[in-house]
């Protein structure tokens, strides 16, 4: 999974961030986080499409939280599976990409109904698709008027400023 935020930004002190990384089988994302100096715990579900609160509780017990201000839970799964489970998060961030199409908020409403923030990633690919940011945002806001929506490209480092601010100010 590409990251919707960059820990390379100097306003985010990596030593004060920890990540609980969910994946079916691999530790590839966790390894990338650790290479950036971020305390990381890997959770492999070996088939389940989401993390559950008891898994988060166990992971938190394994993390040295001294000096940690922010714990990011990177859940696994698709837009449907992960939305059904509360993990104790303070901010729920949903992410979709322009390559997935405009219909996701209406086809899979639960994530968008419960998200505090929605990231539309891969915005740099929009010229090669028929994706409409305006339609996508309107559909999100028809489900959840309070959701903040940001467009970005994690790969190209476009539009990350408000996302960095979100983490830097928490």
Question: What are the residue ranges of the model-derived segments?
Answer:
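Nucleotide-state-sensitive switch-loop elements of NTP-binding domains
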Residues: 1-90, 100-103, 108, 112
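A glycine- and Lys/Arg-enriched "phosphate-lid" helix/loop adjacent to the NTP-binding pocket
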Residues: 100-134
């Amino acid at each position: 999974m590409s990251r919707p935020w960059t820990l390379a930004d100097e306003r985010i002190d990596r030593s004060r961030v920890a990540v609980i990384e969910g994946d079916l089988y691999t530790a590839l994302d966790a390894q990338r986080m650790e290479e950036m100096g971020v305390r990381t715990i890997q959770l492999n579900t070996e088939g389940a499409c989401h993390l559950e609160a008891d898994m988060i509780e166990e992971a938190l017990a394994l993390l040295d939280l001294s000096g940690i201000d922010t714990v990011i839970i990177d859940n696994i799964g698709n837009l449907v599976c992960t939305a059904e489970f509360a993990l104790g998060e303070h901010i729920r961030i949903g992410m979709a990409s322009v390559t997935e199409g405009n219909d996701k908020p209406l086809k899979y409403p639960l994530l968008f109904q419960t998200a505090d923030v929605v990231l539309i990633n891969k915005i740099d690919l929009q010229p090669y698709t028929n994706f409409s940011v305006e339609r996508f945002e309107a559909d999100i806001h028809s489900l959840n008027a309070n959701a903040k929506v940001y467009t970005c490209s994690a790969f190209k480092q476009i539009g990350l400023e408000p996302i960095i601010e979100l983490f830097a100010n928490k």
